[in-house]
């Protein structure tokens, strides 16, 4: 498995996205009523029979459509056979448990909404059990971690960028969940070393990237010795991939990007570089996530 994963990783590192495209034909907005609210989302369907479903969660202040454009995940999903759903958060954010967003403070049940959404789409598209995944940037990544903590029965793996978990958020998954976390050392929004941070919705305190990895290693009953793979970088950046084998075929993988900012690897900065740090151009996070999901379904 690890030999195949290493070969697949070379494909990831060779695939670097171009700047965010303007969608030629944006998917129509769909609606679902949940918790007394009309929630919106967009769906991308690959050609052929889908192999899985990816829930892609936007950053704070963004929308599902902007997440689709930023990550350019649709063509990657077509290659890997994934239906992708891009939901919209209330007040452009998520109830990720930190208490630092409008959805959190007003009691929005985003866990329930997102689980209901993927269960409906799984039924609509015949998605096999164990082939539902989550990826997210920033606040979307925080929400992905919360989903893994609370609904490991639904989500087999997550892949996050520039995100962690609030120190006040309990994590008690019912079974192992594979986790890929990507973090830049020059991220000025979500500090790689953890501690206090100020987001769009207010202040919170978050786990350091290494503490998040250690937490998932413990929860997933991982081996003590990791596989460490330095990767080539660009723009004076250096990427180190640290992988742990874990229970029930799961894995915990940490990609630290020395010199990287609060950006989706393979895409431009979502805000000016002086606000979010340097773009990461040495690999595609979308391709990395898809390969990780390919390998870590149930």
Feature map (PLM): residue ranges:
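Serine-hydrolase catalytic machinery in alpha/beta-hydrolase-like enzymes
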Residues: 27-45, 49-133, 143-146, 150, ...
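Short beta-strand/loop motif that positions the catalytic acidic residue
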Residues: 181-183, 187
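Acidic catalytic loop of the alpha/beta-hydrolase fold
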Residues: 187-190, 262-264
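A domain-start/cap signature at the N-terminus of enzymes
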Residues: 2-5, 19-53, 79, 83, ...
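C-terminal catalytic histidine-bearing segment of alpha/beta-hydrolase fold enzymes
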Residues: 182, 207, 217-298
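Bacterial N-terminal signal peptides
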Residues: 9-18
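Active-site rim elements
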Residues: 101-105, 195-205, 272-280
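Alpha/beta-hydrolase fold active-site loops
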Residues: 51-54, 177-178, 252
